Swiss-Prot record:
The keyword Signal applies. Major surface antigen of procyclic forms. Keywords: Cell membrane, Glycoprotein, GPI-anchor, Lipoprotein, Membrane, Repeat, Signal. Residues 59-92 are annotated as: 17 X 2 AA tandem repeats of [DE]-P. Disulfide bonds: none annotated. It is found in: Cell membrane. This is Procyclic form-specific polypeptide. Residues 31-52 have a biased composition (Basic and acidic residues).
Amino acid sequence: MAPRSLYLLAVLLFSANLFAGVGFAAAAEGPEDKGLTKGGKGKGEKGTKVGADDTNGTDPDPEPEPEPEPEPEPEPEPEPEPEPEPEPEPEPGAATLKSVALPFAIAAAALVAAF
């Protein structure tokens, strides 16, 4: 039977490898993959009200002109089917199955060896 310190060492190695692997995988994803970006998109400015003196003496309610009849739209041509895109290359430093599974395998081997 192995001494108690060997069991504690195995558990410590397991925990260290586990946290290192999970931390590496989370850091490799990066904040841009989670939609956290600096600045916002689509935030327009609010409109300003026009005062009575800004109308330049024009009639505020002009009579609407009759709408012309819409021309018939030509039939759209069928678009050719797009070619399938090749799989993108993984980014350098991105988490892969190998980079995540390796710490688990090392930790499991350490636990098995200790017991």
